[in-house]
Every structure is written in C-alpha cells, then in structure tokens.
C-alpha cells in the first residue's frame, strides 16, 4: 500500500512539472532566424488597418480649373502670379479683356509674361473685345490705358509666342464646353467677354461652377474719384462702371456669383515691408513683381492699394473674408448711379459678396503662396 501511495505521489509531481513546462514561452521564439507560427502571424499586415484614400482626400487633391479674364492692371500681374503658384488652382485659359488696357495692344506683353516668365506654355491666351457692350462710352483715363498697354514699363523677356486666334469670348466657350468638370471664372476687369460668351452660347452656364468677380461697391463709396471725365458718380467701381450693361447681364444670368467688391478688398495696402520680402527672390515671376511694386511705390509716393489679388484668393480661401448673401444687380442706365451695384433684401444663397477682410492674415497668405513657403 505504501509503495502504491508513493507511486501515485510521484505521478502527481510529474504531471505538475509538465503543466508548468507547457506554460513557459518557447525559447526558440526569440532566436534569430527561427520562425514560429506565432511570430509569422505577428508579421502579417492587416489590410483593414491600412489607411486608404477617402473621397474627401481625393477632392482635396483635385485642382480647380480657372479661366482668368483681366484688364491689364498692376494688380492683375500679381493676381496671375498668385494663381500660377497656388497648388489648388489650374489655370486653363487667360483672356485679355476690356478695361484699363486695350486688349490687343498689350497682348504681346502678356504673352511674354505668361509664357516666358511664368512658363505656362500650355495655357491659351486670347484677346477679348476692345469695346464694351454698354453704349455709354465710359472708359478708364487715357494715361492709365497707355501705361497698361506698355505693361507698366516693367522689363519683359523677348517673346515670339503665338496668341490664340480665337476671340476671347469664343475661347471661354470652347474651354467650358470641353471641360470634364465645371469651370470657375475669375474676372478682374470688365464683364464684356463673359457676357458675350453667354450671349453666343447660353448652354455653357451648365458647366460653370461659379464666377468670381472683383468689382462693385455695395456699402462702400465708389472709386472713380473724379477721373471719369464729365461723369458725376460717387457710387460706382471702375470694373463695373466701364461696362455696366455687361455686368448687369452677368449678374442676372443665374450663375452663382462670388463678388469681392471695394467693401471686401479695401485697405489692402502693399507696403515696403511686404515688397521687401520679395527682394532677392530667384523666381522670375517674383523678380518681375518686385520690379513692378518698386515702380508703383514711385508712382504713388509710398504705399499703394491692390484690389484684384484678394479676389483670386477668394477662389480657394474664402475664410479671409466676411460674406453676405443676396440678390444682386447693376444699374446700367446713364446717370449719377451708372454702374452702381445693389443688393436686395431677398436672400440668394448662390450669390455672396465680401464686406470686409482680414488684412494681416490675407497679406501673409498671399506672400506664402507667391514665395512658396
């Protein structure tokens, strides 16, 4: 009996030891070059845990196709440089439009800027209408037009680049109709070529995402400042004033509008401090803008205002502005209110206009984009 009890005890001890051994980790697991089922499973990537692109990411990566219609003002030179540097924008066409320049006279200078300085060789440049739709005959002062036609005496490289043979409005139509996605129009001069495009082919409005406009003054005074010849007008802004009829047609087209009027672009001063940040830049576009701003300091005897480049910013970065909505219109009848932009109480969510901006943040953003920092 004693022997049987001892044997039974030994068996219990043996089973206890074996159970402890089974609980110990396999010593081979941590040895290099030895694979076990457990270590192999640890190295397998779980595809469900991978970060995959989302539709939101894809939309963020997609650039906005933009047609830029300008009238050759100094701010347009800055605006085009900004557009070319903005990674969220794809410039698909440029129109030399009516306004501060004669579109034909300045076309070769703008071709040199577009193709030789900014290297935008794939972007077509077309000449817009040289006369407004509005029969009033109002125009910018002659001295301004002469300066604009000479690209403000800024030195440009020689260029034999061909200008698109199509009329400005026709290039707009063709680009919109052939685009796989909706187009954004940025207009910083008169609305002449946009109105002509809509007259010739009204169906293009279906492929226009939005028209972004620098023009008008809703709550602010106008900026003619007695320079409009015999016209006595304290309420109009130049871009609307010189072709109020075209502006009225665009405003009433039903296409969503984003307006940066004098209200939303006022007090955007170019200072010596801002210009100093361009100095020493190796980029050809930055060097040209630096040269232009130095000339503008001499013309204005100090700091000067820009209006068009804030409108370019509004395409991708509306957060720098305060916005209101409404039904918008333009007074096109000849008289003291010719070219005045007005807003009705009836709210139209498709239309928005800026009533103010954050000057400091806006300036920093523009320089960050232009200087690619």
Task: Give a label for each model feature.
Residues 33-64:
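N-terminal low-complexity, Pro/Thr/Ser-rich intrinsically disordered segments
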Residues 1-11:
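Bacterial N-terminal signal peptides that target proteins for export
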Residues 129-134, 215-218, 261-268, 334:
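Glycine-rich beta-alpha junction loops
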Residues 24-26:
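Bacterial signal peptide processing site
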Residues 126-159:
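Surface-exposed loop and adjacent secondary-structure segments within mature catalytic domains
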Residues 50, 59-64, 79-91, 238-241, ...:
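Conformational coupling and interaction surfaces
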Residues 19-22:
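C-terminal motif of bacterial Sec signal peptides marking the signal peptidase cleavage site
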Residues 58-70, 74-112, 157-259, 265:
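Active-site histidine-anchored catalytic micro-motif
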């Amino acid at each position: 009996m004693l022997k049987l009890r001892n044997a039974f005890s030994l068996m219990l001890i043996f089973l206890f030891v074996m159970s402890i051994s089974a609980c110990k980790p396999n010593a081979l697991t941590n040895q290099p070059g030895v694979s076990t089922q457990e270590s192999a499973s640890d190295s397998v990537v779980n595809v469900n845990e991978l970060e995959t692109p989302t539709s939101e990411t894809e939309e963020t990566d997609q650039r906005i196709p933009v047609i830029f219609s300008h009238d050759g003002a100094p701010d347009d030179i800055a605006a085009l440089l900004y557009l070319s540097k903005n990674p969220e924008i794809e410039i698909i066409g440029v129109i030399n439009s009516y306004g501060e320049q004669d579109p034909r006279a300045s076309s070769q200078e703008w071709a040199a800027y577009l193709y030789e300085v900014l290297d935008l060789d794939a972007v077509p440049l077309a000449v817009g209408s040289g006369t407004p739709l509005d029969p009033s005959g109002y125009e910018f002062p002659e001295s301004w037009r002469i300066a604009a036609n000479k690209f403000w005496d800024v030195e440009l490289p020689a260029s034999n680049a061909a200008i698109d043979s199509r009329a400005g409005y026709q290039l707009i139509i063709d680009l919109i109709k052939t685009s796989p996605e909706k187009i954004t129009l940025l207009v910083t001069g008169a609305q002449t070529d946009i109105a002509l495009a809509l007259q010739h082919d009204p169906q293009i409005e279906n492929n226009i995402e939005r028209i972004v406009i620098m023009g008008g003054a809703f709550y602010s005074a106008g900026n003619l400042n007695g320079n409009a010849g015999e016209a006595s007008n304290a309420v109009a802004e130049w871009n609307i004033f010189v072709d109020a009829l075209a502006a009225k047609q665009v405003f009433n087209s039903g296409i969503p509008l984003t307006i940066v009027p004098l209200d939303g672009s006022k007090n955007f001063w170019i200072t010596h401090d801002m210009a100093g940040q361009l100095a020493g830049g190796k980029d050809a576009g930055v060097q040209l803008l630096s040269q232009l701003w130095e000339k503008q300091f001499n013309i204005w005897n100090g700091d000067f205002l820009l209006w068009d480049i804030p409108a370019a910013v509004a395409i991708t970065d509306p957060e720098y502005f305060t916005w209101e909505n409404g039904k918008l219109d333009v007074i096109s009848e000849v008289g003291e209110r010719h070219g005045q932009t007005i807003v009705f109480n009836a709210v139209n969510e498709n239309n928005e206009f800026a009533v103010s901006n954050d000057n400091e943040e806006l300036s920093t953003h523009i320089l960050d984009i232009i200087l690619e920092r």
